[in-house]
Amino acid sequence: MGDYIVRATAAGGQVRAFAATTKGLVEEAKERHNMSPIATVALGRLLTGGAMMGAMMKNDADILTVQIKGNGPIGSMTVTANPKGEVKGFVGNPQVMLPLKDGRLDIADAVGIGVLSVIKDIGLKEPYVGDTILITSEIADDLTSVSYTHLRAH
């Protein structure tokens, strides 16, 4: 089975849920950018989150850009997505390697302390730009936080 995003709503549209399977997307990114395992996981999380956030956009011409700029060795990461499920991404240092931490890839140390930016271009004169400090640098937690605090009002 290929990649997909599932959307669900409840309470008359007041509650929305999204889930995604993106193994093919992440594998393609790994091959195209010749990424290390830690870069693959980090960019994979951002690609998946960006794809789900892009699916929330209303018009086919809308574009969402998510950027992480941290002080860790992975450098910056950028993902662009749209409501049609088209997504692409870039990682500053695709060859980054760090020792395992408690037997797991250390995404937080690879990303470091930094800022998560969400740019929504919905065809107005200026795009909406929201910046927030990374909370955990694990990417998924940070995307969840920015979605909850900033994007629900827009």
Regions found by a protein language model. Name each.
Residues 2-121:
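N-terminal functional module of multi-domain proteins
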Residues 149-154:
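Conserved small/polar residues in nucleotide/adenosyl-binding loops
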Residues 138-144:
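Long, charged interaction segments in nuclear RNA/chromatin-associated proteins
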Residues 70, 120, 132-136, 147:
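Short, structured patches in soluble enzyme cores that scaffold and shape functional sites
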Residues 36-37, 126-136:
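Flexible, glycine/proline-enriched loop segments at strand-loop-helix junctions
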